[in-house]
UniProtKB/Swiss-Prot annotation:
Part of the 50S ribosomal subunit; part of the 5S rRNA/L5/L18/L25 subcomplex. Contacts the 5S rRNA and the P site tRNA. Forms a bridge to the 30S subunit in the 70S ribosome. GO terms for molecular function: rRNA binding; tRNA binding. It comes from Proteus vulgaris. The lineage of its organism: Bacteria, Pseudomonadati, Pseudomonadota, Gammaproteobacteria, Enterobacterales. Belongs to the universal ribosomal protein uL5 family. This is Large ribosomal subunit protein uL5. GO terms for cellular component: ribonucleoprotein complex; ribosome.
Length: 43
């Protein structure tokens, strides 16, 4: 999970700032929770 957080912090935030014109890192939306759901077939 740390890898994904580092990628978001280092690369995605910079791209969002340039694309939407944010002036501060605090204006960029944050990822708060990621939920995965996987079915296992017949119960």
């Amino acid at each position: 999970m740390a890898k994904l957080h580092d990628y978001y912090k280092d690369e995605v935030v910079q791209k969002l700032m340039s694309q939407f014109g944010y002036h501060s890192v605090m204006q960029v939306p944050r990822v708060e929770k990621i939920t995965l759901n996987m079915g296992v077939g017949e119960a």
